[in-house]
Design a protein with these regions (language model features):
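Active-site helix of classical SDR
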Residues: 124, 160
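Conserved glycine-rich Rossmann-like NAD(P)H-binding loop of the short-chain dehydrogenase/reductase
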Residues: 30-47
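Conserved glycine-rich cofactor-binding loop
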Residues: 16-17
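Conserved NAD(P)H cofactor-binding loop of Rossmann-fold oxidoreductase domains
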Residues: 92-97
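Residue(s) in the substrate-gating loop at a strand-loop-helix junction
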Residues: 144
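Substrate-binding pocket helix/loop in short-chain dehydrogenase/reductase
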Residues: 100-101, 108-110
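C-terminal helical subdomain
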Residues: 177-180, 184, 201-239
Length: 239
């Protein structure tokens, strides 16, 4: 069977997070070249160097970006579009503010929506133009089970992920005629550093980032006409 991912360029935001790093590893194992983006420049440099040592035949580049900075995001998109035709975009970067709406500020709102919604919107908009020219593309937006459920402690996060779900649905309708598939993957809590900040649940029952990444790579690879544009992933817990 031909590997449709061989040689394709994947842009991954939040590439140094627990889930983003797992997705990067699985995609490079499939033969993808990588463009790794993180707000932690030193960390993404180290990660990219490690992958280059393991996969010297693959092209790997890394970029630091603060998604709260609109100009920085726009400059990054221009850079990505000018250098290579990326056909896979994984919007994995996110923030998880734990604060009820009553005590949230406009600054809290802006920070949450700038990272969780505006950045995926701009990146999807910018990179989709190249995907249209090529006639193939995959965009994966990392949502959350909070897209469907409210929470008294994480209201802004829930709202931002619900907005991302709506954005994904609209992009799917807009881009499907160009053979660009848009997915919103909405997992429950994951065993990452971000997941550790949620002390309301049992961390041992959280999803493992490796298994979520495996799902994501599967839907990117699946090239038949059957499609699941929304995926809700949760752990089966047997008492």
């Amino acid at each position: 069977m031909n590997n449709i991912l061989m040689g394709k360029v994947a842009v991954i935001t939040g590439a140094t997070g627990g889930l983003g790093a797992c997705i990067a590893v699985k995609l490079i194992e499939e033969g993808c070249d990588l463009r790794l983006i993180s707000s932690q420049l030193g960390k993404v440099e180290t990660f990219a160097r490690r992958l280059k040592d393991q996969y010297p035949e693959r092209s790997i580049e890394h970029y630091g970006a603060d998604f709260r900075n609109l100009v920085a995001v726009q400059d990054l998109i221009q850079l990505l579009r000018s250098k290579v035709d990326a056909t896979i975009l994984i919007n994995c970067a996110g923030v998880f503010p734990i604060k009820d709406i009553s005590h949230s500020t406009v600054a809290d709102y802006d920070h949450c929506f700038d990272v969780n919604v505006r950045a995926p919107f701009l990146l999807s908009q910018g990179l989709a133009e190249n995907m249209k020219k090529i006639g193939w593309g995959r965009i994966v937006n990392l949502g959350s089970s909070s897209s469907y459920n409210g929470s008294k402690d994480t209201g802004l996060y829930c709202a931002s992920k619900h907005a991302l779900l709506g954005l994904s649905r609209s992009l799917h309708q807009e881009l499907k005629e160009f053979n660009i598939r848009v997915f919103c993957v909405s997992p429950g809590s994951i065993q990452t550093d971000m997941g550790k900040t949620d002390t309301r649940q049992d961390f041992s029952n959280f999803l493992r980032p490796e298994e979520v990444a495996e799902y994501i790579v599967f839907i990117i690879k699946f090239d038949n006409e059957l499609i699941s544009d929304e995926l809700r992933l949760n752990r089966v817990i047997v008492q």
